[in-house]
C-alpha cells in the first residue's frame, strides 16, 4: 500500500471525528456569526496541520479563510477551493442528527461540502507528518457564500486562480463512480417584470392592461430558447402575478434560470431576454439580472489534469471516471479566469441539500490520499 494511503487509512476514524465536529458547527450562508464560528475553528485546525491561515473580513457574510502551505519544490502555487457555508439553518442538526448507517455518515452539510474540507485538511496533515513537500506552494481558499452565488468571494477566487497553475475543487463526487468533473455549465439568472394597468375585470376590462397575459407570451418565448443539442436550457421556475380574480392584473413577474456550455450561448440568451418587448398594447417589460458564472470548460489542460488524477487513483487502488454537470460551483470562476480546474475531489456522497445528505465514510481516506498526491506531484 502506498505510504500516503496507509497514513489515511490509519487516520480514518480521526477524519470522521473532524467531519462530525464541522457538521455540528452549523453554518448557514446568511448567518455570519455561525459561519465565523466554524471559520475560526477551521483556521485553528489548518494551523495545526502546518498551514498559515489568514482571514479576509466580509461585512455581511462570513469571513473568508485563506490558508497557505509550503513552500513547494517549484515556483508557483496550486489552489484548493472549498466553501464552508451550507443551505441548512441553525437547528437543523437537531431535526436531522448525525447518524452512521451502512457505511455512510448522514447529516446536514456532510457532503456539500464539509466532507471536502475534511479531505483537504487531512491531505495537508499527511504531507506535514510524512515530511513530503508539495510541488508548488498550496493556497487554499475556503469561502462562505457559495450556496448563495459567491458575490462576496468571487473577486478573491478569480484573483487567486489567475496566480495558480491548477485549481482543485473539493466539491463532492457522486457514488459509486466518484466522478471527477472536468466541465460544468455556466449560469445566468433573470427576473422579467411586466407592468400593466388594473381595472375591474367585469365592469371595465377594456380599461385595464393585463400584465399576466403579456408575461404569458414571454414565458412561451423564453422556453423556446432552450437548445438541448448544445446543452442550453432556459427554465421559467417561478411566476407571480395579479391580486384578485376580478381585477385585471397590473403586474406580473417571472424568474428565469439559464444554463449554457459556452459564453457565446450565454450572450445569445442574454440578448434575447433583454430584447423582450410588450405584446399586449400599453404593457411595459423590465428585465433585471444577467450572467453569473461562466462555464467550467473542458479543455486540453483540464483533461491532462484529470488523466493525472486518474492515474494516481489507480496507483492508490481505486478508480475514478470523468464527467460534468449542469450544476455550477466556484470552479466555474477559476476556469473562467483561465486556470485549469478539476472539480469533484471531495468525499463521495449524495442527497445534497436534503435531510438525506450523506457521505461514504470509506471515501474520506481515498479522496484525501488522491488530493495529497495531486498536491505533492503537481
Tell me the role of every PLM-derived stretch:
Residues 1-108, 129-134, 331:
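Acidic/His- and Gly-rich active-site-bordering loop/insert found
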Residues 77-79, 105, 165-169, 191, ...:
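Short glycine-aspartate micro-motif
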Amino acid at each position: 500500500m502506498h505510504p500516503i494511503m496507509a497514513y489515511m487509512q490509519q487516520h480514518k476514524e480521526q477524519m470522521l471525528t473532524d467531519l462530525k465536529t464541522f457538521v455540528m458547527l452549523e453554518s448557514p450562508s446568511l448567518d455570519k456569526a455561525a459561519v465565523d464560528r466554524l471559520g475560526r475553528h477551521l483556521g485553528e485546525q489548518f494551523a495545526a496541520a502546518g498551514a498559515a491561515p489568514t482571514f479576509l473580513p466580509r461585512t455581511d457574510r462570513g469571513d473568508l479563510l485563506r490558508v497557505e502551505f509550503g513552500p513547494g519544490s517549484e515556483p508557483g502555487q496550486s489552489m484548493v477551493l472549498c466553501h464552508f457555508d451550507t443551505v441548512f439553518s441553525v437547528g437543523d442538526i437537531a431535526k436531522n442528527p448525525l447518524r452512521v448507517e451502512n457505511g455512510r455518515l448522514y447529516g446536514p452539510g456532510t457532503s456539500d461540502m464539509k466532507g471536502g474540507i475534511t479531505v483537504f485538511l487531512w491531505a495537508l496533515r499527511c504531507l506535514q507528518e510524512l515530511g513530503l513537500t508539495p510541488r508548488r506552494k498550496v493556497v487554499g481558499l475556503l469561502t462562505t457564500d457559495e450556496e448563495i452565488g459567491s458575490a462576496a468571494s468571487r473577486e478573491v477566487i478569480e484573483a487567486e486562480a489567475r496566480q495558480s497553475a491548477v485549481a482543485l475543487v473539493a466539491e463532492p463526487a457522486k457514488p459509486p463512480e466518484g466522478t471527477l468533473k472536468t466541465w460544468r455549465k455556466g449560469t445566468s439568472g433573470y427576473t422579467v417584470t411586466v407592468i400593466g394597468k388594473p381595472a375591474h375585470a367585469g365592469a371595465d376590462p377594456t380599461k385595464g392592461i393585463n400584465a399576466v397575459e403579456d408575461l404569458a407570451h414571454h414565458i412561451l418565448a423564453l422556453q423556446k430558447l432552450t437548445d438541448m443539442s448544445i446543452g442550453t436550457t432556459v427554465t421559467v421556475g417561478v411566476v407571480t402575478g395579479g391580486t384578485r380574480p376580478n381585477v385585471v392584473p397590473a403586474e406580473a413577474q417571472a424568474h428565469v434560470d439559464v444554463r449554457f456550455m459556452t459564453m457565446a450561448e450565454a450572450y445569445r440568451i442574454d440578448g434575447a431576454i433583454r430584447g423582450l418587448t410588450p405584446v399586449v398594447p400599453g404593457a411595459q417589460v423590465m428585465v433585471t439580472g444577467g450572467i453569473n458564472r461562466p462555464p467550467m470548460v473542458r479543455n486540453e489542460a483540464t483533461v491532462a489534469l484529470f488523466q493525472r488524477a486518474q492515474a494516481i487513483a489507480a496507483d492508490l487502488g481505486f478508480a475514478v471516471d470523468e464527467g460534468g454537470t449542469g450544476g455550477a460551483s466556484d470552479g466555474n470562476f477559476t476556469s473562467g479566469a483561465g486556470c485549469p480546474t478539476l472539480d469533484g475531489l471531495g468525499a463521495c456522497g449524495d442527497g445534497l441539500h436534503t435531510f438525506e445528505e450523506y457521505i461514504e465514510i470509506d471515501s474520506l481516506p481515498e479522496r484525501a490520499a488522491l488530493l495529497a498526491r495531486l498536491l505533492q506531484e503537481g
